[in-house]
Amino acid sequence: MFHIGSLVVLCGLLAPTTALLEALPTPLGQTLPLAVTPALAPSPPDLAGSLTGALSNGLLSEGLLGILENLPLLDILKTRGNAPSGLLGSLLGKVTSLTPLLNNIIELKITNPQLLELGLVQSPDGHRLYVTIPLGMILNVKTSLVGSLLKLAVKLNITVELLAVTDEQKHVHLVVGNCTHSPGSLQIFLLDGLGSLPIQSFVDNLTGILNDVLPGLVQGKVCPLVNAVLSRLDVTLVHSIVNALIHGLQFVIKV
């Protein structure tokens, strides 16, 4: 027969044993109840780096550098130069000395294209993101006017606006708003420093043409790639970014 006194002794023995078990660490792979360790929402500091990293990797995977390197830049310049209208046609109409300059260029090739570190800025209201895509490249120029090969360093920024929009089915998407080259961001300079007066004059004239043509040309290649990359981003990352933009949460952006 099980006596009450025995029950009291048994309970007394179990009490310290239970306390010891509770003090033991949780085995690996075992999740504690939410009441003990409440789940934390993804923090904005994680989003900025994750987004720029995903966009950068995506652009490289889409072949951005190869696309830039294979641009038929000289053919495009000569085609537009012969056209009676357009920015370049207007420029050549005003400065007729540029026509023989184009005709005397034997080769104009992009080499060593680079995608530099992406930048990220948030709008003051917190509902939009602006991604800066900085590009660098070298222009190899051969011309009958100059005996040696000229190397021009080129830098250009493309700015992409990202925002959250709601469709007719009330689904929210992360989309590209404006995508354009940053005004005044194009930099072209002679890698070997200042050349002789004829060489520097040639570089200045060529720079004037490239200022009107190159930004729009590069923009036309980069912006469609951004759309393609955006459509393939990790769903969880997109959801977190959209949620932050809708609520105007400030991203912590490391400079």
Curated annotation (Swiss-Prot):
Expressed in trachea, and at lower levels in nasal epithelium. Residues 1-19 form the signal peptide. GO terms for biological process: antibacterial humoral response; antimicrobial humoral immune response mediated by antimicrobial peptide; defense response to virus; immune response in nasopharyngeal-associated lymphoid tissue; innate immune response; multicellular organismal-level water homeostasis; negative regulation of single-species biofilm formation in or on host organism; regulation of sodium ion transmembrane transport. Keywords: Antibiotic, Antimicrobial, Disulfide bond, Glycoprotein, Immunity, Innate immunity, Lipid-binding, Secreted, Signal. Monomer. Interacts (via N-terminus) with SCNN1B, a subunit of the heterotrimeric epithelial sodium channel (ENaC); this inhibits proteolytic activation of ENaC. Gene3D superfamilies: Bactericidal permeability-increasing protein, domain 1 (3.15.10.10). It is found in: Secreted. Lipid-binding protein which shows high specificity for the surfactant phospholipid dipalmitoylphosphatidylcholine (DPPC). Plays a role in the innate immune responses of the upper airways. Reduces the surface tension in secretions from airway epithelia and inhibits the formation of biofilm by pathogenic Gram-negative bacteria, such as P.aeruginosa and K.pneumoniae. Negatively regulates proteolytic cleavage of SCNN1G, an event that is required for activation of the epithelial sodium channel (ENaC), and thereby contributes to airway surface liquid homeostasis and proper clearance of mucus. Belongs to the BPI/LBP/Plunc superfamily. Plunc family. Residues 87-92 are annotated as: Important for surfactant activity and antibacterial properties. Disulfide bonds join 179-223. Pfam families: LBP_BPI_CETP. Glycans are attached at residues 157, 178, 205. The keyword Protein transport does not apply. Coiled coil: none annotated. Its main location: secreted. GO terms for cellular component: extracellular region; extracellular space. GO terms for molecular function: lipid binding. This is BPI fold-containing family A member 1. InterPro entries: Bactericidal_perm-incr_a/b_dom, BPI_fold-superfamily_member, Lipid-bd_serum_glycop_N.
